[in-house]
Design a protein with these regions (language model features):
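N-terminal glycine/serine-rich phosphate-binding loop of ATP-dependent small-molecule kinases
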Residues: 1-95, 123, 151
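Gly/Ser/Thr-rich active-site cleft segment
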Residues: 9-11, 22, 121-155
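Generic structural signal for well-ordered, non-membrane alpha-helical segments
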Residues: 47-54, 105, 131-134, 155
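Structural signal for hydrophobic packing residues in well-ordered secondary-structure cores
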Residues: 58, 62-66, 113-117, 142-149
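Hydrophobic or amphipathic alpha-helical targeting/insertion segments
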Residues: 89-93, 111, 115-116, 120
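Carbohydrate-associated surface elements
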Residues: 102
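Internal, well-ordered alpha-helical segments in soluble enzyme and binding-protein domains
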Residues: 105-108, 117, 134-137
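Internal helix-loop-helix
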Residues: 107-110, 123
Length: 155
């Protein structure tokens, strides 16, 4: 029989489920991780926590199910949107991810709107500048952590 794994990398935990080809749940596992709030309105997580939770829960569902790895034919992943993960030249994480619910980038949103124009910004992106979106987070790092911005080679 063939099997599939679904992984949800959520804000509070990673949930992994192993299904058979009929859609029946064979095994599931979850792993919680912290949300860091170093200041009011800030929300960060460590991408390493996401990776470690995914590896741990995948290992657990495969082990608990007794399913041979070769019989797993597909893997689906869903995750949080708009989290800024900055990587250096070697692909290493530079700083904790500023996640979707972080609100620190109000000034950067104003900067984007002033420079581009509110209507043009919506025309280009289909959205106004918003604190939860990634572009304003990149500007925040540029404005507040220039050493990390300079190290960033991949987002």
């Amino acid at each position: 029989m063939n099997y599939l794994i679904g992984i949800d990398l959520g804000t509070s935990s990673t949930k992994t489920v192993l299904f058979d080809e009929k859609g029946e749940v064979i095994a599931s596992a979850s792993k919680d991780y912290p949300l860091y709030t170093p200041h009011n309105g800030w929300a960060e997580q460590k991408p390493e926590d996401w990776r470690d939770a995914a590896l741990e829960t995948i290992t657990k569902v495969v082990k608990d199910s007794g399913v041979a790895a070769d019989d797993i034919k597909g893997l689906g992943i869903s995750g949080q949107m708009h989290g800024l993960v900055m990587l250096d030249e070697q692909g290493e994480v530079i700083r904790p991810s500023i996640i979707w619910c972080d609100q620190r980038t109000e000034k950067e949103c104003e900067e984007m709107t002033e420079k581009v124009g509110a209507e043009k910004l919506i025309e280009i992106t289909a959205n106004p500048a918003m604190t939860g979106f990634t572009a304003s987070k990149i500007l925040w790092v540029r404005n507040n952590e220039p050493e990390n911005y300079a190290k960033c080679k991949h987002i």
